[in-house]
């Protein structure tokens, strides 16, 4: 179904069965598959491919040569009907690729809302991206990676399969991330190591001085006390009881499967 207010360039192909919302603009030489749903106000600039079982929300801007919903590169993938979901108000720049999920990984690759995916970023199968994240040029995510809200991934950075990147993290450019990065942390290098707390980012997002001080103290326990994670967890949990912002560390530790960067 194509809404009567949608504008589709005559050189583009929209297969029968696709759902195209109000005010959608599909520019020249695009392809939209039969199982695709595109929400109101979204624009495909030109030469964009959206295929597979893919649902795109409202008011997204998708630039030239982006490829969304194509088959993933997992060697186990046998054409199962897996999906891609994208939220609202994302900017998906030139040549970004977002692959559909795998059955083994839950069948879904998901991007939230208000994200900026810069030129040539790659989101592999079963990745889960939160809201208000930035993936800079040529950032590459392996399969099953999770990126929490407000994280920034620098250009030319590669993230290993199954890694979790916490909220408000900043990973510097040209890094290789092979383990999980706790929330609020700045990480850099190959293999990435911690370089303190993303204080400026947290200030911009409204964290008060007391919360920032508590987050710093949690970081010091984690990285500067010379003790193991299991040894410092109880003290960080005590901090979290007094300062709710620190609870993000405790919740993150419970999710981590690859261990945290050191």
UniProtKB/Swiss-Prot annotation:
- CDD domains for this protein: LbH_UDP-GlcNAc_AT (cd03351)
Identify the domain of life. Bacteria
Q: In which pathway does it act?
A: Glycolipid biosynthesis; lipid IV(A) biosynthesis; lipid IV(A) from (3R)-3-hydroxytetradecanoyl-[acyl-carrier-protein] and UDP-N-acetyl-alpha-D-glucosamine: step 1/6
* Entries under InterPro entries matching the protein: Acetyltransf_C, Acetyltransf_C_sf, Hexapep, Hexapep_transf_CS, Lipid_A_LpxA, Trimer_LpxA-like_sf
Q: Which PROSITE patterns match?
A: HEXAPEP_TRANSFERASES
> Which reaction(s) are listed as its catalytic activity?
a (3R)-hydroxyacyl-[ACP] + UDP-N-acetyl-alpha-D-glucosamine = a UDP-3-O-[(3R)-3-hydroxyacyl]-N-acetyl-alpha-D-glucosamine + holo-[ACP]
What protein does this entry describe? Acyl-[acyl-carrier-protein]--UDP-N-acetylglucosamine O-acyltransferase
